[in-house]
Swiss-Prot record:
Keyword Metal-binding attached: no
Enzyme class: hydrolase
Keyword Cell inner membrane (UniProt): yes
Species of the source: Francisella philomiragia subsp. philomiragia (strain ATCC 25017 / CCUG 19701 / FSC 153 / O#319-036)
Domain tr-type G: 2-184
NCBIfam families (alphabetical): lepA, small_GTP
Enzyme Commission number(s) from the entry: 3.6.5.n1
Catalysed reaction, written as an equation: GTP + H2O = GDP + phosphate + H(+)
A Pfam cross-reference name: LepA_C
Family: Belongs to the TRAFAC class translation factor GTPase superfamily. Classic translation factor GTPase family. LepA subfamily.
UniProt name for this protein: Elongation factor 4
GO process annotations (BP): positive regulation of translation
Length: 594
């Protein structure tokens, strides 16, 4: 056991985490030359295209160190984006050390700081590594100072490397061997294994990635899942080298996979503990906290025949993604679908993209909302995660909205413009510090403002250099109202949203104008209105198409013309009473997309 090293890499998007892991695999001969490709561990297409890591992956490598001993390195790749921080905390629960990889040209970013604190809270040894030293703009000394000032860990002798060219990669491996502590645990104790991740394989059933804390798990043995109490028999155990490599057993301190023919998707929940059926341990491994979804949106299939497939797809994804929440929902405008909960907007986009790609579904997503708390006049408090659940304005005493504390790191030149957007988004400044060449700004912002488009705005005003990390801190009373859209007097549930009273008129007007462009003209007038409770705040009309009924008159008497026009008017009036407006799907899509 003293030769096992479990570690993961913490790094901001694009700081070279996946490339560095490729080099580790090459140095330790994990794959033959032929099988090496860029970003071996980013196995999903979306991960490659967007250049981000979404899922945690694990690799076991044998490294012959300079002292002549062979070490087993278990390396768990983690995502860098703020929406996937729960993936990070999960990976860290299985490790004893973490490499903090920082781009020597760019310096420290906000999300790296957040993930680094998670690692320190879990008592991991954090080792700073400066990457990309082959770049002409690299300033290792300045960045080392930044690491010390912002994060507060000693970076004086930080190992430098360039993952792209391969310089210094062996030094990094030596640093891991020297500084990461060996795992603790007893091979002969009762079995305790933590499930770090699970995914569904069409041939094998559920495949789980586990970290054995105590004891040994052999092929053919029976084990049980502690939360459900159900027992299974181990069909295969082994490690990823990154290919699946079968072994006879996994022992304390190791990280590997198990396949036990579990067909039920919820059979091995992530964060659960496995133990032997015949000799169980009494206490589970302390896992990690279950993440609460922060953003909710309705998802609907464009054709209703896809609904059963949609349900199955969500089931399979939720196995692989512990933080996805969903429940059935019915909308008059969009039919059957699910109300889904996500960690943030990127998470929502990724899930939608995975559903469309991996399961061939065509989806519409309603406008995202966060969870409000409505206090009714009779004292009851209800959680509101969709506009339709908001009680009537007369019944509400007050509405509380979630407030997040946002830490923003930006270069000095952009401070002014960042403060401006924070104020526009109803933010309250908490703190502002100059750290090295960067400025750390802390604001309390309403969560709905952060999840809608704050990140994009921040990136554009800081030319891509700003970075953001946020966490929910409290609920605060706010003047929120429900903005309804009425078409010919009928409410369209899919377009309702919860907005701040000050912005309601402006938002309503904008929405109505956009819909006017998108709804095709009918044979009768279509009135589009935005309303708050019983008050109409904006209105627009799609003019009717009319046939020229006088075309056949040629001169003729004025009373004849009047008669024809009156008759047409009557017809239009009757049509308006009984006619219903078909709203094309595109109209919903473009209004919801913004």
């Amino acid at each position: 056991m003293k030769n096992i090293r479990n570690f993961s890499i913490i790094a901001h998007i694009d700081h070279g985490k996946s490339t560095l892991s490729d080099r580790f695999i090459q140095v330790c001969n994990g794959l033959s030359e032929r099988e090496m490709k860029e970003q071996v561990l980013d196995s999903m297409d979306i991960e490659r295209e967007r250049g981000i890591t979404i899922k945690a992956q694990s690799v076991t490598l044998d490294y012959v160190a300079r002292d002549g001993q062979t070490y087993q390195l278990n390396f768990i790749d983690t995502p860098g984006h703020v929406d996937f921080s729960y993936e990070v905390s999960r990976s860290l629960a299985a490790c004893e050390g973490a490499l903090l990889v920082v781009d020597a040209a760019q310096g420290v970013e906000a999300q790296t700081v957040a993930n680094c604190y998670t690692a320190i809270e879990q008592n991991l040894e954090v080792i700073p590594i400066l990457n990309k030293i082959d770049l002409p703009s690299a300033e290792p000394d300045r960045v080392a100072e930044e690491i010390e000032e912002i994060i507060g860990i000693d970076a004086t002798g930080a190992t430098t490397c360039s993952a792209k060219t391969g310089i210094g990669v062996e030094d990094v491996l030596e640093t891991i061997v020297a500084k990461v502590p060996a795992p603790e645990g007893d091979v002969n104790a009762k079995l305790q294994a933590l499930i770090i991740d699970s995914w569904f394989d069409n041939y094998l059933g559920v495949v789980s990635l586990v970290r054995i804390k105590n004891g040994t798990l052999k092929k053919g043995e029976k084990f049980k899942v502690m939360s459900t109490g159900v027992s299974y028999q181990v069909d295969r155990v082994g490690v990823f080298t990154p290919k699946m490599k079968d072994l006879d057993h996994l022992k304390a301190g190791e990280v590997g996979f198990i396949v036990a023919g579990i067909k039920d998707i919820h059979g091995a929940p992530v964060g659960d503990t496995l133990t032997h059926t015949h000799n169980p341990t009494d206490k589970p491994v302390p896992g990690f906290k279950k993440v609460q979804p922060q953003v909710y949106a309705g998802m609907f299939t464009i054709s209703s025949d896809d609904y059963p497939d949609f349900r199955e797809a969500l089931d399979k994804l939720s196995l692989n993604d512990a933080s996805l929440f969903f429940e059935p929902e019915v909308s008059q405008a969009l039919g059957f679908g699910f109300r889904c909960g996500f960690l943030g907007m990127l998470h929502m986009e990724i899930i939608q993209e995975r559903l469309e790609r991996e399961y061939n579904l065509d989806l519409i997503t309603s406008a995202p909302t966060v969870v409000y708390k409505a206090v009714k006049k009779d004292g009851e408090t209800i959680d509101v995660d969709s506009p339709s659940k908001l009680p009537e304005p007369g019944a509400i005493a007050e509405i509380h909205e979630p407030i997040v504390r946002a830490n923003i790191l930006v270069p000095k030149d952009y401070v002014g413009s960042v403060i401006t957007i924070c104020v526009e988004k109803r933010g309250v400044q908490v703190d502002l510090n100059y750290v090295g060449s960067q400025v750390s700004i802390t604001y309390d912002l309403p969560m709905i403002e952060v999840v809608s488009d704050f990140f994009d705005t921040l990136k554009s005003v800081t030319k891509g250099y700003g970075s953001l990390d946020y966490e929910l801190i409290r609920y605060e009373a706010a003047d929120m109202v429900r903005l309804d859209v009425l078409i010919n007097g009928d409410k369209v549930d899919a377009l309702a949203s919860i907005v701040h009273k000050d912005q309601a008129k402006y938002k309503g007007r904008e929405l109505v104008e956009r819909l006017k462009e998108l709804i095709p003209r009918q044979m009768f007038e279509v009135a589009i209105q935005a309303a708050i409770g019983g008050t109409i705040v904006a209105r627009s009309t799609v003019k009717a198409l009319r046939k020229n009924v006088l075309a056949k008159c040629y001169g003729g008497d004025v009373s004849r013309k009047k008669k024809l026009l009156e008759k047409q008017k009557e017809g239009k009036k009757r049509m308006k009473n009984i006619g219903s407006v078909e709203i094309p799907q595109e109209a919903f899509l473009s209004v919801l997309k913004k």
